[in-house]
Amino acid sequence: FLDEIYNNMFKEIFKLLKPQVNQIHNIRCWNNSAIAVMGFFFNDKEMLDFVFHGEYNIIRQIKEGVTKDGFWYEGSIHYNFFTLEGITPTLLFASIYNYDFDPEAKAIVRNMFVSAYNYAFTNLYLPNPNDGWPSINLKTYSYIYSVAAKVFSSDKEIVNILKIILNNKYPRT
C-alpha cells in the first residue's frame, strides 16, 4: 500500500513541486518542506538531496531569506510566521530522522521564533506592519511554538516563550 502511494502520488507531487522551487520566497520554503517530509518518510535520497543541496534549498532559503534581526525579508509578521510554518516541519522531521540539519540555519530559525516573540506587545498581540492580519496574538501561533519547543527542547528560552504564550490570559485570535 505504501509503495503504491509513494510511486503513484508522492513521486508525482515531487515532480510537480520541484520546478516551483525557483527563488528565495516563503512559499518555496513550504515546497521544500513538503518534499523534505516525503523524503524523510520514504527515505528518498533524491528528494532529500534536492531539499538540502538543490539550487534554492531550504538552507539557502533560511540563510538568504532571513534578515540579521531574525525576520523574514518580506517584512510582514504574517509572512514571517507563514515562513516558520513552512520551515519548522523540516526541522522536526530532520530531528526525528537524525538528519544533521545545518547548525547555522537552525540557529537562524530559532532566532526567528525569539524575534517574533520580542516584536509582540506586552499582551502578546503582534504589530501589523506591511501585509497581514490585524489583531493577531502569539497564541494564534502557539502550535508552531509547540513544534519549535520539540525541535529546540533543550533551549530554555524557546520552551519558556511557549509557556508564556500558553499561559497568556488573552484568547487565541
What are the residue ranges of the model-derived segments?
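Carbohydrate-active enzyme catalytic cores, enriched for enzymes
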Residues: A36, H78, F82-T173
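Active-site lining segments of carbohydrate-active enzymes
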Residues: F1-H78, F82, T88-P89, K169-R172
